[in-house]
Amino acid sequence: MSNTDKERAIAAALAQIEKSYGKGSVMKLGQRPHVDIEAVSTGSLGLDIALGIGGVPKGRIIEIFGPESSGKTTLTLHLIAEAQKKGGTCAFIDAEHALDPAYAKKLGVNIDELIISQPDTGEQALEIADTLIRSSGIDMIIIDSVAALVPKSEIEGEMGDAQMASQARLMSQALRKLTASINRTNCITVFINQIRMKIGVMFGSPETTTGGNALKFYASVRIDIRRIGSIKDKEEVIGSQTKVKVVKNKVSPPFKTADFDIMYGSGISKEGEIIDLGVKLDIVEKSGSWFSYKNVRIGQGRENVKQYLKEHPQISNEIEKIIREKSSKITNINLDQTEEEND
């Protein structure tokens, strides 16, 4: 078959598919109107940089997992606040029945506009999520958490009844159904997940997430969040040092990490990240315990500098802008080097 005949055959096949399934159901990748992936900020400057596109991608499934009290819900509330700032409508499926509206408000969430549901069963939770996503009016939906999505058969059964893999089957079926709607409506769907220990693992990590393997495959981004230390004011613990690792990323190179402080009552400390990343990228100068910006001393000690940046938002925003610009250039250089190595 000659090239001309091949082109004619492909054109005829494409025309037939479009006739059957509608315009835009099949096309060449270069003909797509939006090749760039849109993103919503996570509320953490370091994590936005680690994700490579400035936040979590729209129209994708995201999994955030980690041990208890590691900051999973805090991170998702920051995500909601950032989406709402852009005019987005968000929904929270609270399967754990544990959302604190007062804390959400402190983190910048407009609770008057947040749609919330506290379902009784896993099936009910996922049906509600499916209906909201299909409506095309929701920009972000949070499901907290996969472990709390208890199948109806388990709730109606007796205590101690063996329910082998019923939750994994439920998740697998739901994700098959949800994934096309999520992509079509450009809705960010975030699943919060817990960690369990596998019994009898001799080599490698014994940790695993709940709900089977389906979510691991369907998720475009998987974020592992851990508490690595405490922040103290004299003897009082006022926050926790947190480390996140992007363990899977389909939109940018994976395995990048970010560190930030979660302050009790106010969430992720943006000022702390600006100081740390500013010093790392030589934007902020550090000499002993003194910090300087543009040869002007802005404070002694990290906590004092954080307070200074809170009181001077224009300087904070200026440093953040430079950090984002510098980081994107570094990412582009790294990507170019990787492509050259592959060639």
Curated annotation (Swiss-Prot):
Keywords: ATP-binding, Cytoplasm, DNA damage, DNA recombination, DNA repair, DNA-binding, Nucleotide-binding, SOS response. Its main location: cytoplasm. It comes from Rickettsia conorii (strain ATCC VR-613 / Malish 7). ATP binds at residues 66-73. Can catalyze the hydrolysis of ATP in the presence of single-stranded DNA, the ATP-dependent uptake of single-stranded DNA by duplex DNA, and the ATP-dependent hybridization of homologous single-stranded DNAs. It interacts with LexA causing its activation and leading to its autocatalytic cleavage. It comes from the Bacteria. One of its GO terms (cellular component) is cytosol. The lineage of its organism: Bacteria, Pseudomonadati, Pseudomonadota, Alphaproteobacteria, Rickettsiales. The gene is recA. CDD domains: RecA. Belongs to the RecA family. SUPFAM superfamilies: P-loop containing nucleoside triphosphate hydrolases (SSF52540), RecA protein, C-terminal domain (SSF54752). It is found in: Cytoplasm. One of its GO terms (molecular function) is single-stranded DNA binding. This is Protein RecA. Disulfide bonds: none annotated. One of its GO terms (biological process) is DNA recombination.
